[in-house]
Regions:
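Conserved acidic catalytic loop of the alpha/beta-hydrolase fold
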Residues: 52-69
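Conserved HGGG/HGGXW glycine-rich cap/lid loop of the alpha/beta-hydrolase fold
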Residues: 1-42
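Conserved alpha/beta-hydrolase catalytic His-Asp/Glu region
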Residues: 107, 120-173
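Catalytic histidine neighborhood in serine/cysteine hydrolases
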Residues: 199-215
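Catalytic histidine-centered segment of alpha/beta-hydrolase-like enzymes
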Residues: 212-225
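Conserved serine/cysteine hydrolase catalytic core
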Residues: 159-199, 208
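Flexible "cap/lid" loop of the alpha/beta hydrolase fold
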Residues: 80-88, 92-124
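Conserved alpha/beta-hydrolase "nucleophile elbow" surrounding the catalytic nucleophile
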Residues: 5, 74-76, 183
Length: 239
């Protein structure tokens, strides 16, 4: 299983959020790569935009799977690449899980609203990312999110971000077992585009979670674990 993190972080956030749900699945090998320009993965000048990153990720998927079917999951920008990979490799991707996906056609993105916690807790990045401002959420932010910022290649991110939208794929929608999870209070990507996208897929479970924003994997971990567990069960049923 290949799990792709979001923008401005590295594999540590994805691993912290997905691993509790996947650790007990027998025989499931999880791979958490750093996307180009984050963590320990360089972003050479040949990567000019998202289409180039997608091609690199498709090669990675082919390499780590050896051509066998594999699962794909992603959060935020990682979900954007994951759904594109599934569209281009439908016979190879056995299941797709998207959490707070960045997607074309964003609409009705809500204003940021804090639902609980202490005023003034954490730094500006924390307060803009989380809708639960509690000591527990701050601890997760400081452990899994903030340290990755120092390893981001800002110049590379700006270069690739200038061409962030992928070239549309002409094929049919991905038809494998899919999970789409969105935060109702997500002020980064909203939930409307995720709802639209899930509606276009023939075998998608959609969950729009209240009291959760773009940091949904941190804010609603038990619910995410349950949804991922059900998704894995569906994948096994299809196998």
């Amino acid at each position: 299983m290949l799990v792709l993190h979001g923008g401005g972080v590295d594999h540590r956030e994805a691993e912290a959020c997905f691993e509790p749900a996947l650790d007990g699945v027998p025989g499931l090998r999880r791979i958490y790569p750093d996307l180009p320009g984050t963590g320990r993965t360089a972003a050479p000048d040949s990567l000019r935009g998202s289409d180039d990153v997608l091609e690199a990720l498709l090669r990675l998927g082919d390499a780590v799977s050896g051509g066998s079917p594999y699962l794909l999951a992603g959060h935020s920008a990682g979900a954007y690449f994951a759904q594109a990979m599934a569209a281009r490799r439908p016979e190879q991707v056995a299941g797709l899980a998207l959490v707070c996906p960045l997607l074309p056609g964003l609409r009705d993105v809500p204003e940021h609203r804090v639902v609980a916690g202490e005023p003034g807790l954490g730094d500006e990045e924390f307060r803009g990312y989380f809708v639960l401002h509690t000591a527990a959420m701050l601890e997760r932010y400081e452990r899994f999110v903030a340290p990755s910022a120092a390893l981001v290649d800002v110049a590379a991110q700006e270069r690739m971000g200038a061409r962030w939208e992928l070239t549309p794929h002409p094929g049919p929608p991905y038809a494998g077992p899919t999970l789409v999870v969105a935060g109702r209070l997500d002020s980064t990507v909203g939930y409307a585009a995720a709802t639209d996208f899930a509606g276009s897929l023939p075998h998608a479970t959609l969950a729009v979670v209240d009291d959760a924003g773009h940091a949904l994997p941190h804010e609603q971990p038990a619910l995410l674990r349950a949804l991922l567990a059900e998704w894995v069960t569906r994948v096994h049923r299809w196998a």
